[in-house]
């Protein structure tokens, strides 16, 4: 999947995460979280795992975490990535 435009998913509410995805030459992940020292590596690993499953190798991803669970982070990364591409989405494979 190729990222062709800027897209955002999520909110800045407590227990949520806002993920911003935009075109970039390589894969760049920025994590802003009050619990980054404790969970930063896990957050980055989850983001990388979701991007790899979607076949994304070049994008800038900015994660504004407000204490979201891992399943919420996965859903937000998927949603932002799908909004940021012009490719057709195979919804049966996603769901």
UniProtKB/Swiss-Prot annotation:
- Name the Pfam families for this protein: ACP
Which cellular components does GO assign to this protein? cytoplasm
**Which NCBIfam families does the UniProt entry name for this protein?**
citD, PRK13253.1
Give the multimer and partner information: Oligomer with a subunit composition of (alpha,beta,gamma)6.
Q: Where are the transmembrane segments?
A: none
Source organism of this protein record: Haemophilus influenzae (strain ATCC 51907 / DSM 11121 / KW20 / Rd)
Stated family: Belongs to the CitD family.
Disulfide bond sites:
none
Q: What is this protein called?
A: Citrate lyase acyl carrier protein
Which residues get modified to O-(phosphoribosyl dephospho-coenzyme A)serine? 14
Keywords for the protein's UniProt record, in alphabetical order: Cytoplasm, Phosphoprotein
What does this protein do, in the record's words?
Covalent carrier of the coenzyme of citrate lyase.
Keyword Cytoplasm assigned to the entry: answer is: yes
């Amino acid at each position: 999947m190729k990222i062709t435009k800027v897209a955002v998913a999520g909110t800045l509410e407590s227990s949520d995460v806002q993920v911003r995805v935009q075109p970039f030459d390589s894969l760049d992940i920025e994590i802003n979280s009050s619990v980054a020292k404790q969970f930063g590596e896990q957050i980055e690993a989850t983001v990388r795992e979701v991007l790899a499953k979607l076949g994304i190798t070049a994008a800038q991803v900015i994660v504004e975490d407000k204490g979201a669970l891992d399943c919420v982070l996965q859903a937000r990364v998927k949603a932002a990535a799908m909004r940021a591409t012009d490719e057709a989405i195979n919804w049966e494979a996603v769901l």
